[in-house]
C-alpha cells in the first residue's frame, strides 16, 4: 500500500507477536478446510479463523480499552463499511497500544490500528483512508484468495497455508520464510499476486472513501508523507516495506 513503486505498500501487516505467542497457534483447534484439491474457503470458515487469531491477539497484545477511542474507531470504521461493496461479514475495529506505525486486517472482518498510526494521521480522512484500504482487503477476501492461489501451486493443505499467511501478517520475515518453504519456488508469483491485491484494495478503498464523504486525496497524501519520512530509516515501518 505504501511505496508507490510497490503499489502503495502493504497495510495488511499485523502487530509483532513473540515466538511463544506464535507457537500458541499450534494449540488452536482450527477447522479442517481441505487440501489443495479441496473447495473454496467459506465465509463461515473465515469467521472461525478470525476468531481464533483474535484470541491470540487478545492474550498477547496491549489492546486499547479506552471507551472513547474505541467508540470513535468503531463509528468511523462502520461509516466506511456502510459505503463499501461486497460486505459479507460483520466488522470489528480495535486499536493496539504500539507506537510503531502499522495497521492490519484478517479473517472475519477484524481490522486493527496501532496507536502510533492513529497519532500520525493529520486528519480524519487520512485515518479513514487506512481503514478503507483494510476493509477492502476483507471484502475482497484477499487472504482466502491468496491461500487458494497458493494451494493450487503446491501440495500443501489450505490449513497449512493459513498458518503461513497469518504468520506473514504477524511477523513478515518469518512469514515469508514459511511461505517460501510451503510454496517451493512460487514466491515470485505470490509477490505478484500480493501486489495485485494491494492495487485492488487501493481502488476499492478510494471508492469507499468517496462514497462515505471523505477526501479521496487523503490516501496518497498520507501514504506518501510516511514514505518520505521513513525513506532513509534503517528500520522503516513494516507497512512501508
Please provide the spans of the model-predicted regions:
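Conserved RecA-like P-loop NTPase ATPase core
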Residues: 11-13, 113
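Bacterial N-terminal signal peptides that target proteins for export
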Residues: 1-9
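Residue-level detector of alpha-helical hydrophobic segments embedded in or interacting with membranes
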Residues: 14-15, 26
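N-terminal signal peptide c-region/cleavage motif recognized by signal peptidases
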Residues: 18-20
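A structural motif
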Residues: 167-185
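Peri-catalytic and regulatory segments of divalent metal-dependent proteins
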Residues: 24-170, 187-193, 200-240
